[in-house]
UniProtKB/Swiss-Prot annotation:
One of its GO terms (molecular function) is DDT-dehydrochlorinase activity. Its EC number is 2.5.1.18, 4.5.1.1. This is Glutathione S-transferase D1. The gene is GstD1. Residues 1-81 form the GST N-terminal domain. Coiled coil: none annotated. Residues 87-208 form the GST C-terminal domain.
Length: 209
């Protein structure tokens, strides 16, 4: 039994859901109400002392950080290694894209939008410039490429599509970046679990209305 503690609106949680779908793992989903402090209860702290989501528990083995969970699911349950190839160079590029998503692209979203959504802070133009810079980088990575890392779908695409779709519901103009826009339209068609990802995006969209 693979237990999955999550929120549907969370981009990192959605990347795990899509990865699980891609490798055929059924998740026993457990909604965690952060506003009610469920992540701070002793029983959850025992599982994840960092009290973050997503958190996966696979037959007693607990893991958090979405990109680590993605890789674990592919390595343990993938019927092939196509989503995370064993070739060191291919894997290195995928890792770079995952770290880019975590430290640059998704981080730029969090830095700009979260203060507005959760603290009612005014928009910070400097933080918005970081978003634009992140999209310029991604646009460059995708020049002449259908996928984010290599010539087929990988966990890098899945992580990035979870993030980029969240930018879409925040009304960021993805279409200004031609390569990103082309990649994104293709990713919607080829990423397993896209429909559930989009449903989660629409949950998150309520914060912007």
């Amino acid at each position: 039994m693979v237990d999955f503690y999550y929120l549907p609106g969370s981009s990192p949680c959605r990347s795990v859901i899509m990865t699980a779908k891609a490798v055929g793992v059924e998740l026993n989903k457990k909604l965690l109400n952060l506003q009610a402090g469920e992540h701070l209860k002793p029983e959850f702290l025992k599982i994840n002392p960092q009290h973050t989501i997503p958190t996966l528990v696979d037959n007693g083995f607990a893991l958090w950080e979405s990109r680590a969970i993605q890789v674990y699911l592919v390595e343990k349950y993938g019927k092939t290694d196509s989503l995370y190839p064993k070739c060191p160079k291919k894997r290195a590029v995928i890792n770079q894209r995952l770290y880019f998503d975590m430290g640059t692209l998704y981080q730029s979203f969090a830095n700009y939008y979260y203060p507005q959504v959760f603290a009612k802070a005014p928009a910070d133009p400097e933080a918005f410039k970081k978003i634009e810079a992140a999209f310029e980088f991604l646009n460059t990575f995708l020049e002449g490429q259908d996928y984010a890392a290599g010539d087929s779908l990988t966990v890098a695409d899945i992580a990035l599509v979870a993030t980029v779709s969240t930018f879409e519901v925040a009304k960021f103009e993805i279409s200004k970046y031609a390569n990103v826009n082309r990649w994104y339209e293709n990713a919607k068609k080829v990423t397993p679990g896209w429909e559930e990802n989009w449903a989660g995006c629409l949950e998150f969209k309520k914060y912007f209305e």
